[in-house]
Amino acid sequence: MRHYEIVFMVHPDQSEQVPGMIERYTGAITAAEGTIHRLEDWGRRQLAYPINKLHKAHYVLLNVEAPQEAIDELETNFRFNDAVIRSMVMRTKNAVTEASPMVKAKDERRERRDDFANETADDSDAGDSEE
């Protein structure tokens, strides 16, 4: 089986349907005896240029190992699902399991924010004890 990186963009008004779509697509891959190596829901993001008069879309990234038939079925599902405004399937040499740069940056921002919140909480506790 080959490795693939799949990115699809969902209409922003259909964002609440994304978890169901992810479940359906991953189910189709696992039913064909494929494996999901990475699944990232990037959420609603600004588009580089308008697509169908839309300026935002909900992004999802999948790295899978699956037979060609499963990928063909997935592409057909993307094509006939009106909520999917763009999709891209690329074959890769190896399975990619590490977090993408987008997720790494998001995690770093979250860690910095949490560290800052902890520091300010410690500073306010220290200030209270001096009184």
UniProtKB/Swiss-Prot annotation:
Per the UniProt record, one Pfam family is: Ribosomal_S6
Q: Which GO terms describe its molecular function?
A: small ribosomal subunit rRNA binding; structural constituent of ribosome
For bias kind Basic and acidic residues, which ranges apply? 104-116
One GO term of the cellular component aspect?
cytosolic small ribosomal subunit
Biased composition regions of type Acidic residues, renumbered to the chain: 120-131
Which InterPro entries does the protein's record reference? Ribosomal_bS6, Ribosomal_bS6_CS, Ribosomal_bS6_sf, Ribosomal_S6_plastid/chlpt, Transl_elong_EF1B/ribsomal_bS6
Segments of this protein annotated with the region Disordered: 98-131
Q: Which residues form a coiled coil?
A: none
CDD domains per the UniProt record, alphabetical:
bS6
Q: What PROSITE patterns does UniProt report for this protein, alphabetically?
A: RIBOSOMAL_S6
Q: Kindly state which keywords UniProt assigns to this record, in alphabetical order.
A: Ribonucleoprotein, Ribosomal protein, RNA-binding, rRNA-binding
List, in alphabetical order, the GO biological process terms annotated in this UniProt record. translation
Function comment: Binds together with bS18 to 16S ribosomal RNA.
What's the family? Belongs to the bacterial ribosomal protein bS6 family.
Report what the protein is called: Small ribosomal subunit protein bS6
Question: Which gene name belongs to this protein?
Answer: rpsF
